[in-house]
Swiss-Prot record:
<dbReference type="Pfam" id="PF00346">
    <property type="entry name" value="Complex1_49kDa"/>
</dbReference>
<keyword id="KW-0472">Membrane</keyword>
<protein>
    <recommendedName>
        <fullName>NAD(P)H-quinone oxidoreductase subunit H</fullName>
        <ecNumber>7.1.1.-</ecNumber>
    </recommendedName>
</protein>
<comment type="similarity">
    <text>Belongs to the complex I 49 kDa subunit family.</text>
</comment>
<dbReference type="GO" id="GO:0031676">
    <property type="term" value="C:plasma membrane-derived thylakoid membrane"/>
</dbReference>
<keyword id="KW-1278">Translocase</keyword>
<keyword id="KW-0618">Plastoquinone</keyword>
<dbReference type="GO" id="GO:0019684">
    <property type="term" value="P:photosynthesis, light reaction"/>
</dbReference>
<keyword id="KW-0521">NADP</keyword>
<dbReference type="InterPro" id="IPR001135">
    <property type="entry name" value="NADH_Q_OxRdtase_suD"/>
</dbReference>
<dbReference type="GO" id="GO:0051287">
    <property type="term" value="F:NAD binding"/>
</dbReference>
<keyword id="KW-0793">Thylakoid</keyword>
<keyword id="KW-0520">NAD</keyword>
<dbReference type="InterPro" id="IPR022885">
    <property type="entry name" value="NDH1_su_D/H"/>
</dbReference>
<dbReference type="InterPro" id="IPR029014">
    <property type="entry name" value="NiFe-Hase_large"/>
</dbReference>
<dbReference type="GO" id="GO:0016655">
    <property type="term" value="F:oxidoreductase activity, acting on NAD(P)H, quinone or similar compound as acceptor"/>
</dbReference>
<keyword id="KW-0874">Quinone</keyword>
Length: 395
């Protein structure tokens, strides 16, 4: 009996931009052959707000409150990079205590970022219960931020050129250590629930595999890069702030799939806890903000800015602080990867050019490549493993 020939035509399906699994206003134009993905085109720009142009029309002090709106899960990281750029361009020293406080805030933000990724990612693949456990711990981080900065999730407005806005309140370090004591066993609890769960592992192992060479060629960074066997972390490579004072390890895996990216982020939370514990014990005294370094002497009235025996004299950032002539690119390691700022000054209070490099924009570019050949049901798991926030992608 002769069989009838069947002819199939590709079907184009729109995912988003209004769908909770899109993690923001992301639209995916997916071409399907049955249940197989044969092409994918991400459509971005729905949340573009001109953050770079705003920076070029504001002083640095005026711009810091804006930046946490780009990535609500990484507000401290963007505050840090926005003040690091003019600091390095103007060679402004940062007091040691201020640098330690910055590290504490950045590592707390790294844990909060990974928790905010982990809860929705598990919900995307069908595990709803850990979502509520994870948000319980995030609230404790927000309590610490509220005590130190006055705000919880965004608009902390804590970083300043030359330091931070204010010192830590009395008892804050003890509360931070209490959080570390509480959160360490909770990570073990997550791993018991999730890491070796056979359903979870079968669901995401082997999905969205990125080889080492592909990760490098696509300019990936953060957990996306380290999960593919590249041990690259800007905290070690660039040695910014005071990370060289601490003993910690770079978290990396070799498989390059969704499961490896999950393992990297869980291990990073452990390493961040270790850094926070060390910083709380080793934090020195002294001022928390500086624009001048002077040596005071009763015999010699001369001031020596970079002398050996000097003390920092705290001074608020003047609204007329002029960004010197020159250009510079500075970067740091956020929870999603490398974020950077290219700044070009022309001796004015506002920068002539302010270019922002968002980690999740670069990481998102590989999505069409790793989706080809996947099943339609795996799109959400692969997209979720990348960790994108559309506010920083579109800017």
């Amino acid at each position: 009996m002769a069989q009838l020939e069947t002819r199939t035509e590709p079907m184009v399906v729109n995912f988003g931009p209004h769908h909770p699994s899109m993690h923001g206003v992301l639209r995916l134009v997916v071409t399907l052959d049955g249940e197989n993905v044969i092409d994918c085109e991400p459509v971005i720009g729905y949340l573009h707000r001109g953050m770079e142009k705003i920076a070029e029309n504001r002083t640095n002090v005026m711009y810091v409150p804006y930046v946490s709106r780009m990535d609500y899960a990484a507000g401290m990281f963007y505050e840090a990079i926005v003040v690091n750029a003019p600091e390095r361009l103007a060679n402004i020293p940062v007091p040691k205590r201020a640098s330690y406080i910055r590290v504490l805030m950045l590592e707390l933000n790294r844990i909060a970022n990974h928790l905010l990724w982990l809860g929705p990612f598990l919900a995307d693949v069908g595990a709803q219960t850990p979502f509520f456990y994870i948000f319980r711990e995030r609230e404790m981080i927000y309590d610490l931020w509220e005590a130190a900065t006055g705000q919880r999730l965004i608009n902390n407005n804590f970083f300043r050129i030359g330091g931070v806005a204010c010192d830590l309140p009395y008892g804050w370090l003890e509360k931070c250590i209490d959080f570390c004591d509480w959160f360490g066993p909770k990570i073990d609890e997550y791993e018991k629930l999730i890491t070796n769960n056979p359903i979870f592992r079968k669901r995401i192992e082997g999905l969205g595999t990125i080889q080492r060479d592909q990760a490098i060629n696509w300019s990936l960074s953060g957990p996306m890069l380290r999960a593919s066997g590249v041990s690259w972390d800007l905290r070690k490579v660039d040695s910014y702030e005071c990370y060289d004072d601490f003993d910690w390890q770079i978290a990396s895996e070799k498989e390059g799939d969704c499961y490896a990216r999950y393992r990297v982020r869980v291990e990073e939370m452990r390493q961040s806890l270790s850094i926070i514990r060390q910083a709380c014990k080793m934090i020195p005294g002294g001022p928390t903000e500086n624009l001048e370094a002077q040596r005071m002497s009763t015999e010699d009235k001369k001031s020596e800015i970079f002398g050996i025996d000097y003390q920092y004299v705290a001074k608020k950032v003047a609204p007329t602080f002029k960004i010197p002539n020159g250009e510079l690119y500075t970067r740091l390691e956020s929870g999603k990867g490398e974020i950077g700022v290219f700044i070009q000054g022309n001796n004015e209070v506002t920068p002539w050019r302010f270019k922002i490099r968002a980690a999740d924009l670069n990481n998102l570019q590989i999505l069409p490549h790793i989706l080809k050949g996947a099943k339609i049901a795996d799109i959400m798991a692969i997209l979720g493993s990348i960790d994108v926030i559309m506010g920083s992608v579109d800017r």
